[in-house]
Curated annotation (Swiss-Prot):
Keyword Hydrolase in record: no
Catalytic activity, EC: 4.2.1.20
Active site: 49, 60
Source taxonomy: Bacteria, Pseudomonadati, Pseudomonadota, Betaproteobacteria, Nitrosomonadales
Catalytic activity: (1S,2R)-1-C-(indol-3-yl)glycerol 3-phosphate + L-serine = D-glyceraldehyde 3-phosphate + L-tryptophan + H2O
Pathways per UniProt: Amino-acid biosynthesis; L-tryptophan biosynthesis; L-tryptophan from chorismate: step 5/5
Transcription as UniProt keyword: no
Name of the molecule in the record: Tryptophan synthase alpha chain
Originating organism: Thiobacillus denitrificans (strain ATCC 25259 / T1)
Domain of life of the organism encoding this protein: Bacteria
Gene name as annotated: trpA
Any matching Pfam family: Trp_syntA
GO CC annotations on file: cytosol
Keywords: Amino-acid biosynthesis, Aromatic amino acid biosynthesis, Lyase, Tryptophan biosynthesis
Function: The alpha subunit is responsible for the aldol cleavage of indoleglycerol phosphate to indole and glyceraldehyde 3-phosphate.
GO molecular function per UniProt: tryptophan synthase activity
Amino acid sequence: MSRIGQTFTALKAQNRKALISFITAGDPGKGLTVPLMHALVDAGTDIIELGVPFSDPMADGPVIQRASERALANKVGLKDVLAMTAEFRKVNTSTPVVLMGYANPFEHMGYETFAEAAKTAGVDGVLTVDIPPEESLGVSDVFKAHDLDPIFLLSPTTPESRVAQVAAVAGGFIYYVSLKGVTGSANLDTEEVARKVAMVRKHCDLPVGVGFGIRDAATAEAVARIADAVVVGSRIVNEIETAPEGECGARVKHLVADLRRGVDAASKQTENK
């Protein structure tokens, strides 16, 4: 079983939901990414999503776009992201790390070369934003051959037939995007999310994580009542962007600890029913 699978199995045994936290590698500085990864874990993160900087992050809103721009200005590329993961693994061998990015950097390195290097570095899964499931079979096979879980996005507009396609090739967990549009959007409709998550579960045994629009403990709790995992990105990246110099780690830890409390409150409600 993969590290991602082990994490979800252990949490399920404790009647808890996963908190998945996203940061962009190299933002705000090249030397701050690994300390931030440890800060995320210390504050209660179960799985880290590490964004691979890219010059045209079309699925991302302005907050994460700016993070990518800062990381690229810091000259952080895919090889650096893998090196950061390897550095993190010297201390932490249990928290799964998922690389989230666009196909171009992976293609440029070559999928086979990338998958081998990612496995060696200690990466557990890869979410390629712009590869649709019908085009992903060969890539997914390469990832799986190197024990990397291929993770896919589903959205409110994804038809049921496509959900079945994704279920056939996905690993790790399904990432359901709870809002139309780009990352960082607001106005979370939990009833609609609940309907969609139920539909996804009809086709797939993998855990379902829900992201986009989660801002605080209350929205994290609402989503944790529905999904197996709560995914938070823009809110954390915004905290990194606005933190005074030297306070980034402390601010992120404070925010993530609050999100963790929200996620765990949903589990406590379930226990008390």
